[in-house]
Amino acid sequence: MNKKYIFNRVLLLAGTIACMCFIIAPQKKIKVWMIGDSTMCYYGPERTPLTGWGMPFAVFFDSTVQVNNMARGGRSTRTFISEIRWQPISDSLQEGDYVLIQFGHNDEAKEEKYKDRYTTPEDYRNNLIRFIRETKNKKAFPVLITPVSRMRFDKEGKALETHTEYTAIMLEVARQQNVPVIDLDKESRDLYQKLGVEATKLLFMQLEPGEHPFYPQGSKDNTHFNELGARKMAQIILADIRSLKLELAQHVVVRNAK
């Protein structure tokens, strides 16, 4: 067996191994980190039909995207930071990741029973800026989302604003920091107005006593969504990701309703 033959065989084997390594190397996933409150977060089956909009949102991406829903009920920007929920996310961020940021419900809660979560407008602004800057420092992409509107109508059937001050702050921060923002507050309210009072109730945790075994006393919740409402909010977010021309939009897929 001559040396040239052996040399060619070695080259062929090396090339084959290189190709195999290239083929089996796992593709780096785009990670989407979701931080926010109870309107976004995950709920277990024992809470059905209560659904955060982050739950249906996560299924509308192809296999190259990994959605990490880190939202938690009752959290404001302040408590999300003070409870050391943000720092591990910030430390884990990699280039090309996304951070979807929706806070406001609990930040604005001044009632005595919610004083543990209240955040002053100035601190709210500074906390949003911190999320943005730390995300950008990792060459990841922050996306602000104004707090989804609660269901509230006046006696004439007009859908009312429920987050005026904190939504305005977030929109201003987005403009000043030059980051994309999805105005879910306005878009959800526009949806309620289009649907009207009675149809809007079908989006929320509105249950009569005895209607659902998990909620024997019923529920008159104007803040949290059922499966239908969560899906509607997720559809708004996905549509805006496309309209903002985020690279993430290329990985959105159509899922048929079950």
Enumerate the language-model features and the residues they cover.
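Alpha-helical cap/lid subdomain in secreted, periplasmic
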Residues: K3-Y5, Q27, R85-R231, Q235-V254
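Glycine-centered flexibility sites
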Residues: G36, G52, A71-G74, G104, ...
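A generic, residue-level signal for flexible/boundary positions that often mark functional hotspots
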Residues: A18, M34, Q217-S219
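Extended, non-catalytic scaffold segments that flank or surround catalytic motifs
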Residues: G15-A18, V32, D154-K155, T162
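Acidic/histidine-rich helix-loop elements
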Residues: C41-L50, A71-F80, E111-T120
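Serine-esterase "nucleophile elbow" of acetyl-processing enzymes
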Residues: I23-R72, Q87-V99
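Short, solvent-exposed mixed-charge patches
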Residues: N256-K258
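Bacterial Sec-dependent signal peptides at the C-terminal "C-region" and cleavage site
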Residues: F7-V10, A14, A18-K29
